[in-house]
Each structure stands twice: as C-alpha cells, then as structure tokens.
C-alpha cells in the first residue's frame, strides 16, 4: 500500500512539473495549430493584436495562483502583500500612461474585461431601469451600450436599463449629434456613452459633454478600441471631457485580456455664492460595483500583464508603433478606394475602416468566408442603412495586429490587393448561384467546387508566403 501511494505521489509530482506538450498533447496541438494560423495568416480583425512576450510571461506566472478579494490594504485573504504592491503599481502606471493627475483621477484595474467594466459603471451610476444612450450597434456602437431590436432586448444593458440609441447619418456614416441632442432632451438619460466598436472617425467629446451637462447626465467614454492610440497621444483623449472612461487592455493597448475603469475624483463643483465645494463620489460607487457587486477575486496574473503593457505604452517605441497603425490604416483605405471600394465616412482617423460592399453586389458574410479560406481574417459588419443585421453589407478591417508584425504602408497596399482578389472570387462564386441563395448554400459551393477550391488554394498560398515573411510576437514555443 505504501509503495503504491509513493508511486502515485511521484506520478502526481511529475504531472505538476510536465511541460504542456507532454502533459496534454491535444491542447498543445490545438495551440500549435492556432499559432501557425496566426503566423501564416493576415490578421485584420480590428479588435485583435499580438501581445508581447513580456505580457504573456506575466500572464502565465504564479500570480494565477493567488486569491485576493477586496482592494489593496483591504483584502479578505492573507498573503496579499505582493498582490497589493502589484495592483498599486498597475494603478500608478495606468494614470501615468494617460497623463492623469492622481488627485483628480482614480482607476480600478480589477475588471475581467471591457464588458464587465461597462456593466460595473452602469450598476454604479444608473439605478435599475434608469436611462442610457449609446451609439446603436448597426451604426458602429458596441453590444454592451444597450443594443436591442424591435422585437428583443439583446444586451443585458438593455434588459436591466432603459436604452435609447443614437445614430449616424446613413448617407455619410458620421454621427448625427443634432439628433442625439434632440433625443436626449426628450429621453433625459442618466448616462451617455461615447464609444464605438466600428466607427472610423474621432468623437466630438466636447459636444457630447455639453449634451450630457444639459441633461444632468454622466458622460462615459468607452475607449476600448482606441486606448493605445490615446495613450500615445495620436488621437484626441476623452479624459478632458468625460466623468468616467472604460477600456479593454488587449486591443490597441496591446496587453492581455482585461479591463480598466477610470473615474474622476476630488472637487466636482464650487457654489459661486457660498464657495461650498461638492466632491465626486464615483470612486466608492464604482469600486463597490466591481467588488463585491459583480465580481469576486481579481485575476492577478492579468493585472500583471496589464501593468507590463502600460509600461510599454509609455515608451517612444510605442508611440512610433501607434503612428504606424494610423499610417497603415490610411494606406489600406486609399488602396481599397483606388480599387473601387466604398469606405464608410470616406476614410479613417483611427485604426480601422468599414468597407461597404453593397455597390459590388455582395455582402460581408460571404466575403468574410472566402477571405478566411484564403488565410485573411476579418469580420462582417453592418453598414449605415443596412436593412438586416443578419446580412451585414460591410467588412471591418483593422491595422493594429499586422502593424505589430512590422508591416508598413507598402505592405498594406499588397494586403489590399489580396482582399480585392478574395472579393472578386466571392463575386465569381455568386455568379454561378441563384440570386437568393443562402449563406449556407454559398459556403457549400465554396467548399465543394473543385475549380473554386483551386483558386482559393492559389490565393491562400500567396497570402501565407507573404505573411510568413513577418515575425510573430509572443512566446517562442507558441
């Protein structure tokens, strides 16, 4: 019995020390396949990026082992002195990265990601069934900003709060601030959200703040997509005008998957007659909404990864990278325009563009599937004026990930031509099908036609040969 227990215990110790490739060949194989897909493919999904080796090392550290419910100095567990040190360092760097005075701003770095961060703000500042206004999802907003259809409330935000979206002009794709102002005066929201997931122009934060002030509302910026650009100072910052700013940390900021909530603190206003000061109470409201309101223990390994990313975001190299992201996006937009494609709003101020395929006679869902088969990853997206979200007309394309791999403007001109050839192939497939053929039938034709598969293979080989010339950031084994 003792010999058997000793053998089992030795086997147990071996299990704890084995590398992944020996411990779990199936998971290791999947990771290797995904690593190869990223290496040989062109990643154009605007919300994706390639985290640095240092960020991934922090993410895979022993910090994963530690529970630490609560906040620095106020934990519900012992053994958290170094966790406190880490979280306070991350908070300090977050304020430094965005040039914020710690007397006027605070930050919570515990949200698990952007969606929980947003919901924590709503929970903190808007009573149940209180009113929220965000950019409509089909017009470039995010699901968490209150999306619902005529028949169904989709996002939990629209279930637990009353949501009224604001819109863009269908003709230009630009936000209709006049209509927002008019609707806000009737709806009287408690919170207005300045944030997007597919909008290629800078937001008018000053105009949004005035609308918020006129209606006694808070203004919250969701800068998830542009947080790296904001840190580098290459796009307008929301901090001058907003009461609260939320963000993810894995898009243009190029960290691991997590979220942050910045909030104003200190003096909010001074009575001109009495001189009495009124103070912000956002800190306690937001912190209690994150924990214990919506979350348990923070993910300390992720907080470490965020801290590393924030340090990198304060470097000259990071600013050069973000400037290149913008230059590459302009190059991609210009090249596609020259090839005859319509870009919503006519261009971009940031890291993404939305390509409208209606004039070409196809849609985003079909083009996405063909491009994916050719090792080009992007995503279908609704365009202003789309009749159905089930058949979006556009493709959203972003430059952060490929810029992290070292692609420059001339490289994105080649990428544009690869995209063009993929869409031409999409149209070729459609020409051999009924006008009302479903997406399912289209995918069957794409997968089952030998001639089409041969054309796909030819383009895929060219794409993969091109992409393989650029290194992939991250851990060397993966």
From Swiss-Prot:
Protein name, as recorded: Serine hydroxymethyltransferase, cytosolic
Broadest EC class assigned to this enzyme: transferase
Transferase recorded as keyword: yes
In-chain residues carrying the UniProt-annotated modification N6-(pyridoxal phosphate)lysine: 251
CDD domains, per database record: SHMT
Predominant localisation class: cytoplasm
Subunit structure: Homotetramer. Identified in complex with FAM175B and the other subunits of the BRISC complex, at least composed of FAM175B/ABRO1, BRCC3/BRCC36, BABAM2 and BABAM1/NBA1.
Any one Pfam family match given in the protein's UniProt record, by short name: SHMT
Any Gene Ontology biological process: glycine metabolic process
Gene: Shmt1
Organism name: Mus musculus (Mouse)
One function term, GO molecular function aspect: mRNA regulatory element binding translation repressor activity
Subcellular location: Cytoplasm
Purpose of the protein: Interconversion of serine and glycine.
